[in-house]
Every structure is written in structure tokens, then in C-alpha cells.
């Protein structure tokens, strides 16, 4: 049996098993438990009352976190003409068209988000087998296929996160870093929750927000009392 580290033992002793914590207390505990030698991300999971096997109950979207993610996001944009200049002015790291597609085919994927204007999708579509598995394929549902690429770039740089239900009907997303103030993490949590609640499918029946948990990269998961969140 693997030995349990002193750090993990200390973390476990700070959390009551099976207890549901108010969201403010959960965030405080996550910050306290984030003792790794790097700035851990703070992540949240929402277990939703949807049937992800049905296409009309798959939740997907994006939201700009008011306090950002604490991460520098590199943005690549497929567009041309005036849109290309606007994307550069908005802060895009890479802007191109056929030339950018060639770079990607050559294995150069030094970016975190891909944005495309509608006219570029005929080119981007050829990159599905490269971008798709990496979660980089532009999609209008999350605002990454848009005629207003400049605004999309600004959103990505400002701390936009994408969310989507997995096969178990759970949404996983990052709401910041352990170095963030508790109030800032709570504000980001509320923004994400609000977006997910607004995205509730009409076909979803029964309790929508079933379980919530907050954790850090190397910390324990803290279960949240759903009655303590503003949904």
C-alpha cells in the first residue's frame, strides 16, 4: 500500500468527511490546503441534472470571469483583411489564414485558444483532426467563431473560460488561482454558476444543480452545500 504523505494527512485532517460546506467556507479551505510549491489552480465541478446522452441536454458555453483566470492566454486567430488588423490591435498573439493552417499542420501549436471569422472556417475545418482532440476547434457556441474577432480576442485575454458537460453530466472549470483573494474566487464562481444556470436546457427535469465541489490542483475536493450558492 502506498504511503500517505504528511502533507496529504494534514489536508485530510482539516476537512470533515461527508460534510457539505458553505461556498465561502469551501473556498477558504481550498486556499488553506493549497500548499504546493506553485500557484495551484482552483477548480470547480458542477454535477447537473441533465442527460448528456441527449443532444438537447448537452450544455456548452463560455463566460468571462470578472477577476480573470490568473493565466496568460495565447490566442491564435484565423481571419484576413481588416479583421486581421483588428485582431492584432485587440492583442492576438498569432493572426493568419492559409499560412497559419500550414504552421499548425507542421506541428506549431503555441497557443491556448483558436478564434476564427466565419469566412475562415473552410480552412479551419481541414484542421479538425489536429485541433479537435486538443479542445481547440473554434465553435460558435463558445464565441470562438464570430465576425467580431476583436471582441473574442479581448474576451479570451480577459479571462474567458469555456465549459461543457462531460459524459457523466458534470461541468469542470477553473475559477482562478490559489493566490487569488477569497472574494475574487467567489466572484468568479458566481459568474460561472450564473452562466451555467442560464444555460439550463428546457428538456432538463428535476433538480438541476445536484452536487458542487471545489478543489485545487494538488488539494482535496471540498463538497459544497448547494443551498449556500446563489442559483
UniProtKB/Swiss-Prot annotation:
Binds directly to 23S rRNA. The L1 stalk is quite mobile in the ribosome, and is involved in E site tRNA release. Protein L1 is also a translational repressor protein, it controls the translation of the L11 operon by binding to its mRNA. It comes from Neisseria meningitidis serogroup C (strain 053442). The gene is rplA. The lineage of its organism: Bacteria, Pseudomonadati, Pseudomonadota, Betaproteobacteria, Neisseriales. Keywords: Repressor, Ribonucleoprotein, Ribosomal protein, RNA-binding, rRNA-binding, Translation regulation, tRNA-binding. Part of the 50S ribosomal subunit. This is Large ribosomal subunit protein uL1. InterPro entries: Ribosom_uL1_bac-type (IPR005878), Ribosomal_uL1 (IPR002143), Ribosomal_uL1-like (IPR023674), Ribosomal_uL1/biogenesis (IPR028364), Ribosomal_uL1_3-a/b-sand (IPR016095), Ribosomal_uL1_CS (IPR023673). One of its GO terms (molecular function) is tRNA binding. The keyword Transcription does not apply. It comes from the Bacteria.
Amino acid at each position: 500500500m502506498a504511503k500517505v504523505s504528511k502533507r496529504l494527512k494534514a489536508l485530510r485532517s482539516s476537512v470533515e468527511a461527508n460534510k457539505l460546506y458553505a461556498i465561502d467556507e469551501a473556498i477558504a479551505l481550498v486556499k488553506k490546503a493549497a500548499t504546493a510549491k506553485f500557484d495551484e489552480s482552483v477548480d470547480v465541478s458542477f454535477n447537473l441534472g441533465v442527460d448528456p446522452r441527449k443532444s438537447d441536454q448537452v450544455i456548452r458555453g463560455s463566460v468571462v470571469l470578472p477577476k480573470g483566470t490568473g493565466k496568460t492566454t495565447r490566442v491564435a486567430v484565423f481571419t484576413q483583411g481588416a479583421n486581421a488588423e483588428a485582431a492584432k490591435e485587440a492583442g492576438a498573439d498569432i493572426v493568419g489564414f492559409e499560412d497559419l493552417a500550414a504552421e499548425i499542420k507542421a506541428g506549431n501549436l503555441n497557443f491556448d485558444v483558436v478564434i476564427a471569422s466565419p469566412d475562415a472556417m473552410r480552412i479551419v475545418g481541414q484542421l479538425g483532426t489536429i485541433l479537435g482532440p486538443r479542445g481547440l476547434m473554434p465553435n460558435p457556441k463558445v464565441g470562438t467563431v464570430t465576425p467580431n474577432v476583436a471582441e473574442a480576442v479581448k474576451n479570451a485575454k480577459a479571462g474567458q473560460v469555456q465549459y461543457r458537460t462531460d459524459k457523466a453530466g458534470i461541468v469542470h472549470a477553473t475559477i482562478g488561482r490559489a493566490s487569488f483573494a477569497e472574494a475574487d474566487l467567489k466572484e468568479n464562481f458566481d459568474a460561472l454558476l450564473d452562466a451555467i444556470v442560464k444555460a439550463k436546457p428546457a428538456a432538463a427535469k428535476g433538480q438541476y444543480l445536484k452536487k458542487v465541489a471545489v478543489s485545487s490542483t494538488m488539494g482535496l475536493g471540498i463538497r459544497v452545500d448547494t443551498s449556500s450558492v446563489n442559483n
